[in-house]
Every structure is written in structure tokens, then in C-alpha cells.
């Protein structure tokens, strides 16, 4: 289904958080991974693109970025969601035949229907996965995550923590 959520002429659309994450739109056709990472971190996608570039990223690059940014995460071998909460998932692209598309999925089995909520970063006028997941038929590369982390991690840690960590690593055995 086409993303037809453009505001009427002369009006700005107010974006509301979805289960604690602020939806964002990818700046080009291949930055869905960067945009999902930005939503997980709670930063503008431009900051993630400045760090990781505006070219397509694969699942290995996503996993490295998750670790670099200090996001608490766990990759799963099999695709069925088993943990409540947010997941990075890869699904068939609805806009580029034969390509993959990165999405965020929230899983809460007690929330009726399929128990999932989808954040699709595809841009205006693009085919998108529905928020309720009704048109999502398959996915893979499931990575559960706890929103947070920082583009500056571990440099973004407070001074007391750095001092404590330094003391722990420089002690005698």
C-alpha cells in the first residue's frame, strides 16, 4: 500500500512516537538500515548517515553498528519473535524487486491481531508495510533490541564511569 500520509497543502504533519520510538523516513532509497538505527538510537537519521554513509548497509554492518553504539541487542537464528519488545527485521522490499528492506517490529503477543507493530522508514509515495503488519508475510535476520545507545558510545559515558572502568582494567592481577 502506498504511503499516502502526506499532510494537506500548507499544513505540517505532526509525527507522534510509536511505543516510545519516533518514526523517521529514510533520506534515499537505500538508507532503510540507517533510518531504523536512528529510530532505535532516538537521533535524527542525518546523524547516522553522517557516521555510516548513505549507501546500502547489510545485516553484518547493522550488527557492527549496534555494537559500536552500545545498543543492548540479541540476534536470533530463527525468525519467529520470542521476546517482547523491539526488533530489527529484514523483509522483502515492496519497492525494489529482489531487494531486502529493513523494518522495526514491536512484538507484544497480548496486543491482539498478530501482536506486532511495524515502523517502516520508506518515504512518501512508496509502498509501505502497514503499521499492524497485516501485509507482512515473511521476514528474517531478527535482532531484538532495547532502544537507546549513543553514536558517541563509549565516549558518551559519564566521567565517573570511565574512571571506574579505567581503574578496573589497570589493576594488578
Predicted regions and their residues:
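Cys-His-centered catalytic/binding microenvironment captured across papain-like cysteine peptidases
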Residues: 2-10, 25-27, 31, 108-173
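Conserved active-site-adjacent core of cysteine acyl-enzyme catalytic domains
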Residues: 43-143
